[in-house]
């Protein structure tokens, strides 16, 4: 990432979401290059204080998405700004270069620039091969990804970015054994240093669930938490392990299952509090609070539900074209006993998942847990009806 920030002819930085990493990287770019940095934002109310005076391209979001009209206007404005930036690359847009005349910036040696460009070209080719693998199915898809994996050879620091792309491709293909094998092939120091690698590793261990896989997943996630406050993603992965244990033990050992349920709730709560804009842990928190069904849990559900509904609504709610956003709005409607909204969401989900029915089955798993718990806050007749509709695909 730093190489790209230092060497890219033009950098487009979107600050719609107040992400600390993005602002840090914007600062790196401004310290290194005098010009050709373009800021974009879909935030209402202007830019944050420290960059409020900088020139930015504003665009309008409607229900968390760009309308065709807004997208066309944004594309035109961005094309003009990129052209201007390239034509007038000597004009400083960095506040640091504007403040200190003659500030030298950072100039990398020419041979290093050539090496970086070669690596960037190789990364582009790897991503094209992985994208081509996505259209394949079953063993053919996994083998296409494995071919890229084998071509990587021994994983060094310079190979981390393409290795993460391969890991993500394995995850999307459901090739858990291959994902785990690639992580375990990495040098231990490199593996420990990457949060993303460890998150993908824990995800795969939990889903594979062979032998002590889940205990190992917990250890991996605990090591991440020990290094830094848990992110929404890390907390959500931890919660998922306990949620799966809850689902597997609720019939045979209800007392043990109750303990797993409370730990899952705690981790989903921590994930949502870490970043209330991330709807995934919030939706699961609401569903598990409804499954708990106790007075305290239902009181927390009533407090939490509006915030999670808002987070999902920012991304379009049931009007979204993303299945998981609509499915989240669906689950929240059920948790809030809003059956008319749940019915509308379900209709849209079925159209979005028409070529991938496994998505509907995944959503049904949460509702099956809800039905088994039979919480007093959820209407059982309506719940049974939506489960039948999900099963129909």
Give the positions of each predicted feature:
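An anion/phosphate-binding loop that grips the pyrophosphate of nucleotide cofactors and donors
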Residues: 8
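Cross-kingdom TIR/SEFIR domain
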Residues: 15-84
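C-terminal interaction surface of TIR/SEFIR-family domains
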Residues: 55-129
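Amphipathic alpha-helical repeat scaffolds of TPR domains
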Residues: 117-139, 143-146, 153-169, 189-208, ...
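Helix-turn-helix repeat elements of alpha-solenoid scaffolds
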Residues: 132-147, 168-183, 205-222, 254-265, ...
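Solenoid-like repeat scaffolds
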Residues: 149-157, 184-192, 223-229, 270-274, ...
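Alpha-helical linker/edge segments of TPR/alpha-solenoid repeat scaffolds
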Residues: 208-213, 245-252, 289-302, 336-341, ...
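TPR/TPR-like (Sel1-like) alpha-helical repeat modules
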Residues: 265, 272, 277-279, 286-290, ...
